[in-house]
Amino acid sequence: VLIIAVLFLTACQLTTAETSSRGKQKHRALRSTDKNSRMTKRCTAPGGACYAAYTCCSNACNLNTKKCVLS
């Protein structure tokens, strides 16, 4: 009985996902790209301008010169 319930719930989720994504196929790539860009942290290379250590790829910022340095 448990196996049948799991199969039924899985089938319901698959059909719901299929019907909700109809007509939106061309936008799926855009959503994926937006999600990836939000997850990607951009950092400043050594020698670039910085205001705090977390903006540098090396996590080291010389606050006197306001440039990222190698750590």
UniProtKB/Swiss-Prot annotation:
It comes from the Eukaryota. InterPro entries: Conotoxin. GO terms for molecular function: ion channel inhibitor activity; toxin activity. Residues 18-40 form a propeptide. Keywords: Cleavage on pair of basic residues, Disulfide bond, Knottin, Secreted, Signal, Toxin. The keyword Protease does not apply. GO terms for cellular component: extracellular region. Residues 1-17 form the signal peptide. Disulfide bonds join 43-57, 50-61, 56-68. It is found in: Secreted. Pfam families: Conotoxin. The keyword Magnesium does not apply. Expressed by the venom duct. Belongs to the conotoxin O1 superfamily. The presence of a 'disulfide through disulfide knot' structurally defines this protein as a knottin. This is Conotoxin AbVIG. The lineage of its organism: Eukaryota, Metazoa, Spiralia, Lophotrochozoa, Mollusca.
